Curated annotation (Swiss-Prot):
GO terms for biological process: lipid catabolic process; phosphatidylcholine metabolic process. The lineage of its organism: Bacteria, Bacillati, Actinomycetota, Actinomycetes, Mycobacteriales. Keywords: Hydrolase, Lipid degradation, Lipid metabolism. A motif (DGA/G) lies at residues 456-458. Residues 309-469 form the PNPLA domain. It holds the Pfam family Patatin. A nucleoside 3',5'-cyclic phosphate binds at residues 24-140. PANTHER family: NEUROPATHY TARGET ESTERASE SWS, NEUROPATHY TARGET ESTERASE/SWISS CHEESE D.MELANOGASTER. A motif (GXGXXG) lies at residues 313-318. PROSITE patterns: CNMP_BINDING_3, PNPLA, UPF0028. GO terms for molecular function: lysophospholipase activity. InterPro entries: Acyl_Trfase/lysoPLipase, cNMP-bd_dom, cNMP-bd_dom_sf, LysoPLipase_patatin_CS, NTE, PNPLA_dom, RmlC-like_jellyroll. This is Uncharacterized NTE family protein MT2641. The active site is at S342, D456.
C-alpha cells in the first residue's frame, strides 16, 4: 500500500509536453510539434459530462491530458476506455464522417482539442503519422465489440459524513485489498483541502497524482475525511468508480453530494442499527459492519472476489443447505452473500445473520424439534393450514431484524399473485421476507404486503441463481435440490405409519392406486413449474452442488440428519473437484 499526501499545486502542463507524450505523435519532428502546440485548446471536462455524442460532426480530435473517458456505442454499451496520452475522435476526422460513438468522462479530466483541419493538414505532411493512425484504427476495430465482463472499479472514494475519522478504516480496507493486489491511498490533509476556494484548483492539483496512482496500482482509495470540505468531498465523489460511505449517525445528513447518488455505494456501518433512510437516500449495493470481517468483505467486493451462495427451495430437503454450508466453511471457503427461495430463503437468512455452521444447524434442529410446522390444519378456505405455527417459528427465529442490519448480504424471492411478478426482497423485515418466500399456495396462507399478495417464490424461480449472478462482484455457488420424485404412499393428514385400507383410499381418491398427498403434489409442482435454465450457462457460476436428497420426503423434517449428511457429501465432492473454491 502506498499513501500520497500533498497540497494543491497548479500543474500547468504545457501543450508541447502533453502532445509529445501521445503515442501517435511520437514520430513527428520538433518543428511540426511546435506548430501543432500553438493551435490546440485546453479544456476541462467535468465528471459524467459528454465530450461528444454519436452522430455529431467530427470537427476535432482530443488528446487526454488527465482523467478517464469511455467510448459508448449508440446501443449503450461501453467498448473502449481512454486515459492520459490517448487520442479521442481521430478516426472520425480521418474518415470525414459523423461520430460513430459518444465519449463520456468517467471523472474530471483535461483534454487538448485539435481542430479537424489542423490535424488533417499535419497528417498529409507526415507519412509516419499515417502509419501510426492505421495501427490505431486496427486497435479500435478490435475493441469495438461489447465487453463480455464488467469493468472492475479501480478508484474508490471513501467519505466520512459525520464525526468518525476515516483514516483508520481506510488503512483496514487497504490492508484487506493488499491481499488481492496493489493499493494506493490519496489522503491530503483536511486543513489543506478545506481551505481551497475553487474546484478547478483541485482538478489541476490532483489529476496527475490520481492518474499516476491508477497506472501503477490495482486500486486507488481517495479519502474525504471529516472536515475535508465540501469541494474536496465533491471532487472525491466525481473521481470515483464507487463510493464507500461511513455511517456513524442514525440518520443521513440533510446535504448529500448529488454525485453520491450516481455512483455504486457501499456502506460501512459504525453503529448497530442505522435508520433505513440511509438506504432510501443512497441505494447501496452492499453494507458492512465496521470490523475486520466487514472490511474483508468490502475488499473482496471491490476486488471482484466476493463469493455468493444461492440455494433452492425443496421443503425438508432444504435442510441439506445447512450441511453444505458446514462443509464449505470448515474447509475455509468464505461466503459473503446469500440468497434463496423457500427453504433456501430460511437457510440464507440464518447464514446472513452471521451464524456459524454449528449454530445454524442447532437452530435448525430447534426449529423442527416441536410439532410439525405444517400441522395446524384448518378448513381449506385460503390454505390447508392456518399458518400460525409457521408465523411463530419464523418470528422466533429471526425476530424483528431488518435486512438492512444483517452483517452479510441477503435476498429472498417470492411471487406476487396480483401481478405475476417475481419479487426480490432486499429491504425490510427478515421475517417478512422469509415468510413470503415459504408461503406455498394452497398449503400456507399468502402474505399481504401493501398491494402485493405474496406466495412462495418457487412458482417462478426456485433456484434464483440468475438474481445472484447479476451481482458482478464475484462468483456464485449454486445448491440445486432437483431430484427424481419419489412420492410417499400415505395420506398427508394421517401419520406416515398409517396405511389407509383400499376401500378408504378408493372413497377418498376415486382410485385404487397410491397417490401422493396434496402437500407433496404442490411442492413437486414447483419443481416442474420453476425456471429450468441451464445453470452452467449463467455468468460467474463457480460451482453447482447437487445433494442427493431423493430419499428424503419433501415434508419429512425429521430426516434432518440424512439431509445434513447429503449436503456435506455433495459439498465435499465439489471441493475435491474444485479446490480453488478455498481462497
Amino acid at each position: 500500500m502506498t499513501t500520497a499526501r500533498r497540497r494543491p499545486k497548479r500543474r500547468g502542463t504545457d501543450a508541447r509536453t502533453a502532445l509529445r507524450n501521445v503515442p501517435i505523435l511520437a514520430d513527428i519532428d520538433d518543428e511540426q510539434l511546435e506548430r501543432l502546440a500553438t493551435t490546440v485548446e485546453r479544456r476541462h471536462v467535468p465528471a459524467n459530462q459528454w465530450l461528444f455524442h454519436a452522430g455529431e460532426p467530427a470537427d476535432s480530435i482530443y488528446i487526454v491530458d488527465s482523467g478517464r473517458f469511455v467510448a459508448v456505442a449508440p446501443e449503450g454499451h461501453v467498448f473502449a476506455e481512454m486515459a492520459s496520452g490517448d487520442s479521442i475522435g481521430d478516426l472520425g476526422v480521418i474518415a470525414g464522417a459523423a461520430r460513430s460513438a459518444g465519449v463520456r468522462a468517467l471523472r474530471d479530466g483535461v483534454v487538448w482539442r485539435i481542430a479537424a483541419e489542423t490535424f488533417t493538414d499535419m497528417l498529409e505532411a507526415t507519412p509516419l503519422l499515417q502509419s501510426a493512425m492505421l495501427r490505431a484504427m486496427a486497435r479500435m476495430l478490435r475493441q469495438s465489440r461489447p465487453a463480455k465482463t464488467a469493468r472492475r472499479p479501480r478508484v474508490i472514494g471513501v467519505v466520512s459524513n459525520g464525526d468518525t475519522a476515516a483514516a483508520p478504516m481506510v488503512d483496514a480496507i487497504a490492508t484487506s485489498l493488499d491481499s488481492h493486489g496493489r493499493t494506493a491511498v490519496i489522503a491530503p490533509p483536511v486543513e489543506t483541502t478545506s481551505a481551497v476556494q475553487e474546484y478547478d484548483e483541485l482538478v489541476e492539483a490532483f489529476s496527475e497524482t490520481l492518474d499516476r496512482a491508477e497506472r501503477s496500482n490495482d486500486w486507488v482509495l481517495v479519502v474525504a475525511d471529516r472536515g475535508a470540505g465540501d469541494l474536496w468531498r465533491h471532487y472525491v465523489s466525481a473521481q470515483s468508480d464507487r463510493l464507500v460511505v461511513l455511517v456513524d449517525q442514525r440518520y443521513p445528513p440533510d446535504a448529500v453530494d448529488s454525485l453520491a447518488t450516481q455512483r455504486p455505494v457501499h456502506l460501512i456501518t459504525c453503529l448497530a442499527e442505522p435508520d433505513p433512510s440511509w438506504w432510501d437516500r443512497l441505494a447501496p449495493v452492499s453494507h458492512h459492519p465496521a470490523n475486520s470481517d466487514g472490511f474483508g468483505a468490502l475488499a473482496r467486493r471491490i476486488a471482484g472476489r466476493s463469493l455468493g451462495l444461492v440455494m433452492a427451495g425443496g421443503g425438508a430437503r432444504g435442510l441439506a443447505h445447512f450441511g453444505v454450508y458446514q462443509e464449505l466453511t470448515e474447509a475455509g471457503v468464505v461466503i459473503d452473500r446469500f440468497g434463496g427461495t423457500s427453504s433456501g430463503a430460511i437457510a440464507s437468512a440464518a447464514f446472513a445473520l452471521g451464524m456459524d455452521a454449528g449454530d445454524a444447524i442447532a437452530a435448525a434442529r430447534e426449529f423442527i424439534a416441536g410439532s410439525d410446522p405444517l400441522d395446524d390444519y384448518t378448513i381449506p378456505i385460503s390454505a390447508l393450514t392456518r399458518g400460525g405455527r409457521v408465523d411463530r417459528l419464523v418470528q422466533g427465529f429471526f425476530g424483528n431484524t431488518l435486512i438492512e442490519h444483517l452483517p452479510r448480504g441477503f435476498f429472498s424471492v417470492s411471487a406476487d399473485m396480483i401481478t405475476g411478478d417475481q419479487i426480490i426482497h432486499r429491504r425490510g423485515s427478515v421475517s417478512g421476507a422469509v415468510r413470503a418466500s415459504i408461503s406455498i399456495p394452497g398449503l400456507i396462507p399468502p402474505v399481504h404486503n401493501g398491494e402485493q399478495l405474496l406466495v412462495d417464490g418457487g412458482l417462478l424461480n426456485n433456484l434464483p441463481a440468475n438474481v445472484m449472478c447479476a451481482d458482478t462482484d464475484g462468483e456464485v455457488i449454486c445448491v440445486d435440490l432437483r431430484r427424481t420424485f419419489v412420492p410417499s404412499k400415505g395420506f398427508g393428514l394421517l401419520p406416515p405409519i398409517v396405511t389407509p385400507p383400499g376401500l378408504l383410499r378408493r372413497l377418498l381418491t376415486g382410485t385404487d392406486n397410491a397417490l401422493p398427498p396434496l402437500q407433496e403434489t404442490l411442492l413437486r409442482a414447483f419443481d416442474l413449474a420453476a425456471s429450468t435454465a441451464n445453470l452452467r450457462e449463467l455468468p460467474r457460476v463457480a460451482a453447482i452442488i447437487e445433494p442427493d436428497v431423493s430419499k428424503i420426503g419433501v415434508l419429512n423434517f425429521k430426516q434432518i440428519d440424512a439431509a445434513l449428511e447429503a449436503g456435506r457429501m455433495a459439498a465435499r465432492a465439489a471441493l475435491q473437484a474444485q479446490p480453488d473454491l478455498v481462497r
